[in-house]
């Protein structure tokens, strides 16, 4: 839903309504080509429920944004009428700028009059680019040098919480696995040269981390810097080799994935570089957190994602978009090993919290059976609630809001929320500022 779909009638009514305890948000959708098509997409179904816009079966619906970022701003809806003319809509960012008390003083002192997190739902049917997000210092540098490509100066740590079975590439495999990759995938040596490739066999587990990382950095940078023509030829030969080998043996999961990526991005360097990364499969309810400067690529599935409020992405493979190979290869940490999978911890019988090691955000997941209730205690910062399935009600001390799938609600600081399920199961997610941040003040 672009900005041209919103009627903005000024801030006066928003200022008058700034004291409301719960406000509905109208949210923004991104139609990237890797998104699921039409009604197959969870994002499409949420958009239809949230905005009333009909789903087009020919269009990919990739991301559902909830927040204040200028690349996809949410709007606050005021007015009780049923027609567009009866309502006033302003951006969530304008509203919190006019009413900083909604954020709480601790949040304003730390991040100013803005939401420090960005909340999303992703529906993925085709692999996203091999990418990483910059830390704060690099984000400031990139934004200063190329503000059209890097739209803000913020870092972007994030968490991805699986709603359906979810697959991703994330982080570099172990040193032992990298040695097996160089041995078993001769096409890598073709692209980087034997002098570089053989260096992986001259480092060992007991060597200093920096020595190991420097070798991995060298090989990976050489690989990602290969010429397009050479890459296309080598990736094609690798595909043909793997297809031939299927007649004699069962391919590994990674090899099968690489063949699938080759169908999606024929001749792309990201196809062969996938061998360097951990192949992660998340079950619903499991989560993956991604720090700055860690390589990753989502492969398929639906997830809820939360991050620091940024849209900065450095890409280098599996994409038709701009690639910044030099920046990506120089920024990565080259930390080796399988990433930590978060399963969350229970707050109540119905609520699970996911608490990554970042100040800006945490995510709660609530599965509430019919007739059951739970309480989200008041916190010193703002929250955004998303109903992803079912229906129920949210209550404060003075108001009640009936909610259904696709409803997104902004709750100001210091408001306790009581939730009751009114369907077989109501599934909702809450994003808020990390409770660790408030505990350390």
From Swiss-Prot:
The protein's required cofactors: Zn(2+)
Biophysicochemical property: temperature dependence: Optimum temperature is 48 degrees Celsius.
Keywords, comma-separated and alphabetical: Isomerase, Metal-binding, Zinc
GO molecular function: mannose-6-phosphate isomerase activity; zinc ion binding
Description of how activity is regulated: Inhibited by EDTA, Zn(2+), Cd(2+), DTT, p-chloromercuribenzoate and L-ascorbic acid (AsA).
Keyword Flavoprotein: no
UniProt-listed Gene3D superfamilies: Jelly Rolls, Phosphomannose Isomerase, domain 2
Signal sequence region: none
Cofactor note: Binds 1 zinc ion per subunit.
Tissue specificity comment: Not expressed in any organs under light (at protein level).
InterPro entries documented for this protein: Man6P_Isoase-1, Mannose-6-P_Isomerase, Pmannose_isomerase-type1_CS, PMI_typeI_C, PMI_typeI_cat, PMI_typeI_hel, RmlC-like_jellyroll, RmlC_Cupin_sf
pH note: Optimum pH is 7.5.
Catalytic activity: D-mannose 6-phosphate = D-fructose 6-phosphate
GO biological process, one term: GDP-mannose biosynthetic process
Record bears the keyword Cell membrane: no
Domain of life where this protein originates: Eukaryota
Induction (record text): By sugar starvation, by dark and by 3-O-methyl-Glc (3-OMG). Down-regulated by sugars. Up-regulated by DCMU, an exogenous photosynthesis inhibitor.
Pfam family, one: PMI_typeI_C
Binding of Zn(2+), residues: 131, 133, 158, 296
Active site: 315
EC number: 5.3.1.8
Pathway membership: Nucleotide-sugar biosynthesis; GDP-alpha-D-mannose biosynthesis; alpha-D-mannose 1-phosphate from D-fructose 6-phosphate: step 1/2
Family label: Belongs to the mannose-6-phosphate isomerase type 1 family.
Function: Involved in the synthesis of the GDP-mannose and dolichol-phosphate-mannose required for a number of critical mannosyl transfer reactions.
Name this polypeptide is given: Mannose-6-phosphate isomerase 2
UniProt organism field: Arabidopsis thaliana
């Amino acid at each position: 839903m672009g900005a041209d779909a919103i009627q903005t009638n000024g801030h006066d009514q928003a200022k008058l309504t700034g004291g409301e305890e719960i406000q509905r948000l109208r949210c923004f959708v991104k139609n990237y080509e890797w998104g699921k098509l039409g009604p197959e997409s969870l994002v499409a179904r949420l958009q239809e429920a949230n905005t009333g816009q009909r789903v087009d079966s020919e269009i990919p619906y990739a991301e559902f944004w909830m927040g204040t970022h200028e690349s996809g701003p949410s709007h606050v809806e005021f007015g009780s009428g049923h027609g567009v003319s009866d309502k006033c809509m302003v951006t969530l960012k304008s509203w919190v700028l006019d009413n900083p008390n909604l954020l709480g003083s601790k949040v304003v002192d730390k991040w100013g009059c803005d939401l420090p997190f960005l909340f999303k739902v992703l529906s993925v049917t085709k692999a996203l680019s091999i990418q990483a997000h910059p830390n704060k210092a690099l984000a400031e540098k990139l934004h200063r040098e190329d503000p059209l490509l890097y739209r803000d100066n913020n870092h972007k740590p994030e968490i991805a919480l699986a709603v359906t079975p979810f697959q991703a590439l994330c982080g570099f495999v172990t040193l032992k696995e990298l040695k097996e990759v160089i041995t078993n995938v001769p096409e890598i040596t073709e692209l980087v040269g034997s002098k570089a490739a053989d260096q992986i066999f001259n480092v060992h587990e007991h060597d200093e981390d920096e020595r190991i990382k420097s070798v991995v950095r060298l090989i990976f940078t050489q690989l990602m810097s290969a010429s397009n023509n050479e890459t296309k030829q080598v990736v094609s030969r690798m595909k043909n080799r793997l297809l031939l080998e299927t007649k004699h043996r069962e391919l590994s999961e990674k090899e099968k994935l690489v063949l699938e990526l080759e169908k999606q991005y024929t001749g792309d360097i990201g196809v062969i570089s996938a061998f360097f990364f951990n192949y992660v499969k998340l079950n619903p309810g499991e989560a993956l957190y991604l720090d700055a400067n860690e390589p990753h690529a989502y492969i398929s599935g639906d997830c809820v994602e939360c991050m620091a409020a940024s849209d900065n992405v450095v890409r280098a493979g599996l994409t038709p978009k701009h690639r910044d190979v030099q920046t990506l290869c120089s920024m990565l940490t080259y930390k080796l090993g399988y990433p930590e999978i978060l399963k969350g911890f229970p707050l109540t019988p119905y609520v699970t919290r996911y608490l990554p090691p970042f100040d800006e955000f945490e995510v709660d997941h609530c599965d509430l059976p019919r007739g059951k209730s739970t309480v989200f205690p008041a916190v010193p910062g703002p929250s955004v609630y998303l109903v992803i399935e079912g229906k129920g009600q949210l209550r404060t001390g003075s108001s009640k809001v009936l909610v259904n799938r696709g409803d997104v609600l902004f709750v100001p600081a210091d408001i306790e929320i009581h939730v009751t399920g009114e369907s077989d199961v109501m599934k909702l997610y809450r994003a808020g500022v990390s409770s660790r941040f408030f505990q350390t003040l």
